[in-house]
């Protein structure tokens, strides 16, 4: 949610900021702005809407070598230019961009800023006014004013601050919100995400919570809030420019759907050797063996991926698995087993709700494993162990390849633990072979895109509501499929356990109500789900079937190649991703950037 970019040094700041903001569009936003300065002039430009709207307002005379930029997703105050970042202090001297939520902003406003005039309703404007007050009224230095403000502010934040009277420096601080420093020759940068600056540098430095950074063109100084200087090593980001471009695709989502066979094969090469033996960190295996219960904590699509792996993990590891919504567990952690282990699923590794749970787990001494797509992310740094899903950058807001990669990665983990326990079922599970078949199944489904588009046009062209139904793992896939459809097509859609239809949901079925039925796993499951299909069809529902090969009948709509039952959720979800994509496309919507949504939810 939101994005920050900043640069100081021998570069064209306007170009770098705008390119960086464009790379952060996937995070979600409703307004944007930049502040650019040099020794002779400063320019502050803000706009509601897309980055293209901001670019249209920037004149050729907006130039400078230092600047900060921001994409905003409204939390405090509506989406207006006054509420868009960057924000300025009372006199306009100080300029600030901010990601996060300042929890005590009203207290700060009444306690410290009586008589100040505010242009908008944001918590960020309160922060920059506070810094300005400490400098211009209380006569503190800029650095001391920033530190004092940080000692008062409560909540989550990533700040980038500039002084229009000394434009060769950017001041940075963070707490519970992601921020990176990009390193260059004769210039340095700050950004929320390495993708924003990968065109300019591949060298980055992590900063931790409650650390302050002073950026000049030739130096990066990191201190704690008491002023003690800290040493930070840099790392090279393993990103390729081709990975973050759309290429010939109209939307990132379609590109990322198409990349899933490659992701499956990448996971095979990462977690298996040439002979097919699974390779997972032995310390992770030992930790799971010592646990008496695994708790999977996640949000959104990652939560659904957890459900899709629950049965597999339990069967192969002989360890009970419990699922939890991270946003709920952060406030109320239920009674735990005697030897719990937490597994946190997060594409970005920055999900604020999951981090809140992790902080509690660490305080309780509970071992944790983060399964993520982003090395060096907050969750990966703060958890006991990390397992990467190697899906490559996922830019479309609606997650596709991260979901399937999480399931595949956890399959390697489950098999590794089962083998270590001597479980025969795990020893017999030829995961490399089976996952190769999954990749082929995905490719077969992707070759039928025209068929899916045709089915979607007939089923969902004008509807406002739809339902997915399934049993067992198909129910878990139905939950994810419904989320995907509602996210990007704005069709109200719910995924239900097929057996629950008679317990209330069937009252919503009327003439031409779209119902998409998922059928895999066994003849018994297929028989019962087909009974539910007859029930909704008798009430006028328009039914579309997605059926695993071998369970299909004449008249079924989409046939999916048969794969191992543990991996069936990967194969079965692919048609539903395409259904969501074409439903959005046919309605003329922005597939990659659905309204009101952010890719990485970095505030609670």
Swiss-Prot record:
Q: Where is the active site?
A: 2 (nucleophile), 599 (for fru-6p isomerization activity)
Query: Superkingdom of the source?
Result: Bacteria
Under the heading Pfam families, the entry gives:
GATase_6, SIS
What coarse category fits the chief subcellular location reported for this protein?
A: cytoplasm
Molecular-function GO term, any one: carbohydrate derivative binding
Q: Name one GO cellular component term.
A: cytosol
Subcellular location(s) of the protein: Cytoplasm
What Enzyme Commission number does this protein have? Answer: 2.6.1.16
Q: Which CDD domains match?
A: GFAT, SIS_GlmS_GlmD_1, SIS_GlmS_GlmD_2
Entry keywords, A to Z: Aminotransferase, Cytoplasm, Glutamine amidotransferase, Repeat, Transferase
Record field: catalytic activity = D-fructose 6-phosphate + L-glutamine = D-glucosamine 6-phosphate + L-glutamate
Q: Which residues form the Glutamine amidotransferase type-2 domain?
A: 2-218
Report domain SIS positions: 284-423, 456-594
Check the record and name the SUPFAM superfamilies matching this protein. N-terminal nucleophile aminohydrolases (Ntn hydrolases) (SSF56235), SIS domain (SSF53697)
> What's an example GO BP annotation here?
UDP-N-acetylglucosamine metabolic process
Q: Subunit notes for this chain?
A: Homodimer.
Tell me, what does this protein do in biology? Catalyzes the first step in hexosamine metabolism, converting fructose-6P into glucosamine-6P using glutamine as a nitrogen source.
- Protein name stated in the entry: Glutamine--fructose-6-phosphate aminotransferase [isomerizing]
Q: Which organism is it from?
A: Streptococcus pyogenes serotype M18 (strain MGAS8232)
